[in-house]
């Protein structure tokens, strides 16, 4: 008898704690995704690379970021690192970053007094190299830099030219409803001089950067076709690195402007596949106008990986299930499958009724309460059987990049379908390939808890004990100890309270039913 009372006391105190958290979550302001933490048990970050995160299922434009605002800063880290390596021993990292980036803080008003003068100083150093005459820039930097060093000179001269192109390529740091007029760089002589430097260089580091600078200058010129001509003439000799794929993205953009949509989409898919930093950009830019454009783009693919990349973006806009089927046939190890699988599972979750209520039939009709059995029966019909079959097939084969993703996904869907025994088996199978990360461990534990609680149709002293440890973890330990904002446990927390409340109500224990009955649905 004491054990039962202790169990009840523990459950009650935990429920009260969670009720307080529920009020906080319901009333707090903040940036959270309508299709995120509060509507899902399946955390996509567990399974897909960070570069895909804006493409996770979202109620907004892009998951977690809303809009893509990194157009000016996306490659700052790469640029600083590359030049720091080139200038190692010649220029300290702080100085390199100063000249390359300047002040990275967005400025919303004019503040000439505090404006960093890095661009003016680069121009002054360029004038010094050209005239050999001292000026303010050499007076400031002459003692800090060896201006006679060849690498220092190369750095300054490159930045001088790059900053000229930045006058048209760098956008403002604010968002506007008004359409932005595209700027062009019309100094044909300077563009040609950049290309001429590229042609004369032998140093691979500098040659690679002047190649990209030429592409960038041609892209922002009033004769963009010359960018494509230059790319076609030189691409075979260019290293297939980030700069190459940035250049290829320019070619894709020009083709789009020329209304060559199939070519544009084919090229964007290549960039999506090979350059993670540009995934959000290429996904946004990928726009087949009709089925013919899509078919032509597919026909351009030279191999299965290129076809898989096309389907990977197509699945973002259209049908994740179809895209998964196609990619799995083409390349089972494709990492693109991971993010598409999370989108598919998250979309299936959205159809599940966690409120234990049915909407009223007429206007102003109150929702009708459901029993646990009625709620389970309804939800079983909402899970797409063809999606379950597809994920089960891939899980059984075990030949993807991340087998645990498919094992956990099918286990979760089996829980929703009421197939608890097979869900247990697949969770056990997932453990064999599960990475030893906090997020992966928490994800598996959470879904096992959902499965274990779902097994309970009637509460007994015996089956209460099977969930006590996980309830303590979910209601008390996680809110107290988990400092991140990625792991999706709030939905399971709210659902489990509603589930237990209904079980206690059906048992005739109305005190416990009332304690567990408070959920986020009470505040909406």
What label would you give each PLM region?
Residues 22-216, 221-524:
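Extracytoplasmic/secretory-pathway proteins
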């Amino acid at each position: 008898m004491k054990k039962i009372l202790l169990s009840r006391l523990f459950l009650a105190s935990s429920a009260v704690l969670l009720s307080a958290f529920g009020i906080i979550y319901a009333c707090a302001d903040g940036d959270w995704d309508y299709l995120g933490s509060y509507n899902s048990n399946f955390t996509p970050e567990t399974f897909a690379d960070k570069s895909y995160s804006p493409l996770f299922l979202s109620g907004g434009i892009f998951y977690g970021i809303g809009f893509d605002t990194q157009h000016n800063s996306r490659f700052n880290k790469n640029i600083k690192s590359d030049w720091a390596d080139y200038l190692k021993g010649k220029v300290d990292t702080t100085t390199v970053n100063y000249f390359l980036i300047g002040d990275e803080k967005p400025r919303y008003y004019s503040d000439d007094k505090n404006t960093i003068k890095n661009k003016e100083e680069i121009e002054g150093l360029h004038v010094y190299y050209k005239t050999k005459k001292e000026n303010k820039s050499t007076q400031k930097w002459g003692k800090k830099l060896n201006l006679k060093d060849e690498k220092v000179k190369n750095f300054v001269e490159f930045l001088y030219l790059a900053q000229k192109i930045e006058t048209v390529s760098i956008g403002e740091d604010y968002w506007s409803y008004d359409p932005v007029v595209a700027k062009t760089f019309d100094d044909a002589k300077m563009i040609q001089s950049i290309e001429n430097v590229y042609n004369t260089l032998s140093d691979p580091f500098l040659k690679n950067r002047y190649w990209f600078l030429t592409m960038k200058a041609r892209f922002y010129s009033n004769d963009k076709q010359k960018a494509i001509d230059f790319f076609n003439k030189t691409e075979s000799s260019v290293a297939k690195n980030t700069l190459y794929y940035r250049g290829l993205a320019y070619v894709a953009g020009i083709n789009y402007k020329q209304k060559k949509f199939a070519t544009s989409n084919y090229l964007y898919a290549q960039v999506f596949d090979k350059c993670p930093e540009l995934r959000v950009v290429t996904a946004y830019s990928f726009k087949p106008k009709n089925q013919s454009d899509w078919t032509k783009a597919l026909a351009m693919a030279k191999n299965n990986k290129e076809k898989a990349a096309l389907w990977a973006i197509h699945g973002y806009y259209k049908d994740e299930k179809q895209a998964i089927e196609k990619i799995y046939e083409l390349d089972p190890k494709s990492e693109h499958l991971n993010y598409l699988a999370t989108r598919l599972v998250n979309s299936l979750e959205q159809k599940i009724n966690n409120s234990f209520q049915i909407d009223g039939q007429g206007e102003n009709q109150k929702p009708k309460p459901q029993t646990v059995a009625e709620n389970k029966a309804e939800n079983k019909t909402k899970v797409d059987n063809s999606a379950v079959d597809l994920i089960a097939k891939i899980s059984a084969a075990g030949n993807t990049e991340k087998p645990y993703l498919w094992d956990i996904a099918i286990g979760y869907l089996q829980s929703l379908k009421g197939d608890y025994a097979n869900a247990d088996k697949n969770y056990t199978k997932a453990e064999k390939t599960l990475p030893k990360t906090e997020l992966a461990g928490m994800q598996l534990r959470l879904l096992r808890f959902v499965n274990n609680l779902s097994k309970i149709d009637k509460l007994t002293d015996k089956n209460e004990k099977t969930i006590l440890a996980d309830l303590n973890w979910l209601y008390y330990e996680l809110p107290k100890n988990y400092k991140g904002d990625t792991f999706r446990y709030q939905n399971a927390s709210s659902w489990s309270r509603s589930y237990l409340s209904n079980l206690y109500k059906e048992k005739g224990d109305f005190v416990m039913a009332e304690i567990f009955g408070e959920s986020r649905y009470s505040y909406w």
